[in-house]
Amino acid sequence: MIIVTSGHVDHGKTALLKALTGTSTAHLPEEKKRGMTIDLGYAYLPLENKVLGFIDVPGHEKFLSNMLAGLGGVHYAMLIVAADEGVAVQTKEHLAILRQLQFHEIIVVITKADRTNSAQIESLIQTIKQDYSFLRNANYFVTSAETGQGISELRHYLANLAELADTQKPFRYAIDRVFSVKGAGTVVTGTAFSGTVKVNDEIYLSTGQKIRIKAIHAQNTSSEQGIAGQRLALNLNADLDRTPMKRGDWLLQNEPLPPTDRISVQILAEVPLNESQPVHIYHGASRTTGKLTLLQGKNAAKNDRTLAEIILDSPLFLAFGDKLILRSGDTKTLIAGARVLEINSPKRHKRTEVRLNFLANLALAENASQRIALTLQHNATTARQLMWTEQLTSLQLDKALAERDAVRYQDWCFNPNYVQEKTQQILTALNIYHEQHNDQLGVSKARLYRMATLNQPENLIHHFIDEMLDDGRLQQTRGWIHLPEHKIQFNTEEKSRWTDVLNEFEKANGQAIWVRDMANALAIDESIMRNFMYKAGKLGYLTPIVKDRFFLTETLYAYARLIKQIAEEKGKVSVNEVRDKLNFGRKLTVQLMEYFDRMGFLRRKGNDHILRDKNVFDL
């Protein structure tokens, strides 16, 4: 367990921790010389069944970013106030930050009790309670590092604090120091936000590389594992020259998504805010600049809780519920705290009623299952996105989906309402197509996707179409998808003509035939033959690859299977390969390949073609 100590410079934080633990948290020569904490200092108190870790955060405002690096993933804080000086400038700053980060408990410790009297101390405590409502029910301890007053009572209270660390979620660790140790190699230090890590585990650096854990020091003791809420030093199997890392990077169990530069948040205003203003954003050991924009009005008063968007100048690795500190553009003023509701928020339609209700409900949701249900109301989302946003393992995601009757297909997650909505869009689009083109048999799968649900996951919509074909809501005739009740057919004269046309295609040995050539061969007017061959195309017997040039549909499908086989074996297929396999001229081969591109079966890549949707021409 980690406990943060904060307060004004020279109010005795470091001395208090030395009295509690026997360890001085000043670790830089400059700190010892100046008598103030500049970077994060650490002390440890071994107990019977655990080790308490204390982070001594710097009190001087110049070192605020260092202070904020120590607050991520911690549930308890001690506010240090000197009895002889009371609430000072940095005390107020730290109080605001502690309130914004919403610690489970803030313990107020009055130090230097030997320098004043009990009446003055009681007056100070009452002033704090009166001025800071969130500390009225806090526990107060009166101490002196010089005389030992109150130290044992405080130590006993801290030893009995409940463990609140979330060890069940994936491991997530913010790096605040990186250095090399002779004989050991790369070492990082930081705080574990969540999860568990063990020696020899392979985890991700936030830049994407996988790294093995060689050794662990948890709470300043060699250990086989580290858990959430602990201060950890990790010896990594990584060369800093080959795998650069720095303060602000992360070590992660889940493969990270790309960092985000646009987020939706709920803020608690510390000062009156305008609709839009530049801000400095602090998260874990990271710091960047950006723009804060209110979503629910032109301004916000102090203590207002409201929805907002933050556009980051440098992207951050954020997840739902992460806490941010926002300071003014000149960094002089703490203006708000923020809780992340959504990463990669949309660029348009940010203030619609539906959108604001969605964000408000996210803020009110009590668990991941409820938030996932909200996210999946109208869209499918990848499992990887949900696992990252909610910081869940794959099994935890499956459990959350099951609680909401949601479904996971390959990497996509969706709910039954989404399936119903999209399948109805498919049926509606196909019905409109039949009304407007009643002489056409149907459409290809790729075209149906574009007609009905463009901008939805293509492989997922194809899956829905396949299910609709299986259960009879759709039918497929010679590759063309249509509604079951939609029919077109030849009359008696056309049936006879089809026999003659089919005979000509058999003579052509798999070649395409032009309308005029077929008309000449059968001594029929070209316009009549054109209308007939296009009707045969609508019935699915023939397929035009360019205007007036047709293949037998079954032959075209055979060629598609051949090309699919080549592309799957080699990863690509060229015009020359197809020309040689089919014994075509180059012009016909190019027309065939371009037709397959248009149908969504292939996609041109340089001088080759690769499979786009290998199932388009499956019968």
From Swiss-Prot:
GO molecular function: GTP binding; GTPase activity; guanosine tetraphosphate binding; selenocysteine insertion sequence binding; translation elongation factor activity
Subcellular localization, as worded in the UniProt entry: Cytoplasm
Region G5, annotated ranges: 144-146
Region (G1), start-end ranges: 7-14
Domain of life: Bacteria
Entry binding sites for GTP: 7-14, 56-60, 111-114
Residue numbers spanned by region G2: 35-39
CDD domains: DEP_RGS7-like, SelB, SelB_II, selB_III
Keywords on record: Cytoplasm, GTP-binding, Nucleotide-binding, Protein biosynthesis
Cited Gene3D superfamilies: P-loop containing nucleotide triphosphate hydrolases, Translation factors, Winged helix-like DNA-binding domain superfamily/Winged helix DNA-binding domain
GO annotation terms (biological process): selenocysteine incorporation; selenocysteine metabolic process
GO cellular component, one term: cytoplasm
G3: region residues: 56-59
Coiled-coil regions listed in the entry: none
Region (G4) location: 111-114
Domain tr-type G: 1-169
Family: Belongs to the TRAFAC class translation factor GTPase superfamily. Classic translation factor GTPase family. SelB subfamily.
NCBIfam families: selB (TIGR00475), small_GTP (TIGR00231)
Function: Translation factor necessary for the incorporation of selenocysteine into proteins. It probably replaces EF-Tu for the insertion of selenocysteine directed by the UGA codon. SelB binds GTP and GDP.
Protein name: Selenocysteine-specific elongation factor
Gene name of the encoded protein: selB
